């Protein structure tokens, strides 16, 4: 095999990898910006309303904003919470919820999209409310 052919293929692979990395960085930056808007305009107000409704029902949850995030934590257990996160592990970055639930000595931890397959910009207040109601079911059963 000729050296020029090998050099050409390696150069093409480097250019493709750099272009892919640039696209990935741009996608991540726009997703972070959209996620910030999502937290501020949708997730925080709806979660605050849910926390108030839970308090009225006698179920104690506290709303917190650790490190620019949003967490709805059960007052009974320090490991019981629902936290909004940006899930960039897939092809399309998504707003997701990290649900941590302790049962005895076990802690169940899972990350669930707010609305599977939906871009962050497409989410609505109803989507956030539906996600929270589903995520809260284990605590509401008690």
Predicted regions and their residues:
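Intrinsically disordered, low-complexity regulatory segments enriched in Ser/Thr/Pro
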Residues: 1, 75-126
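Amphipathic, interaction-prone secondary-structure segments
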Residues: 48-96
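Conserved non-transmembrane functional hotspots
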Residues: 26-28, 68, 140
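Contiguous, amphipathic alpha-helical segments that mediate oligomerization or scaffolding
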Residues: 16-57
């Amino acid at each position: 095999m000729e050296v020029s052919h090998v050099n050409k293929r390696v150069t093409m692979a480097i250019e493709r990898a750099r272009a892919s990395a640039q696209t990935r960085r741009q996608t991540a930056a726009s997703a972070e910006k959209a996620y910030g808007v999502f937290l501020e305009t949708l997730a925080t107000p709806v979660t605050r309303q849910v926390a108030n409704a839970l308090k009225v029902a006698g179920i104690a949850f506290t709303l917190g904003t650790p490190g620019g995030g949003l967490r709805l934590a059960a007052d009974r257990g320090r490991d019981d919470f629902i936290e909004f996160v940006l899930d960039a592990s897939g092809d399309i970055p998504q707003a997701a919820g990290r649900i941590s639930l302790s049962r005895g000595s076990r802690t169940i931890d899972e990350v669930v999209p707010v609305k599977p397959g939906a871009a962050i910009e497409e989410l609505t207040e109803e989507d956030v409310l539906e996600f929270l109601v589903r995520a809260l079911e284990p605590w509401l059963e008690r």
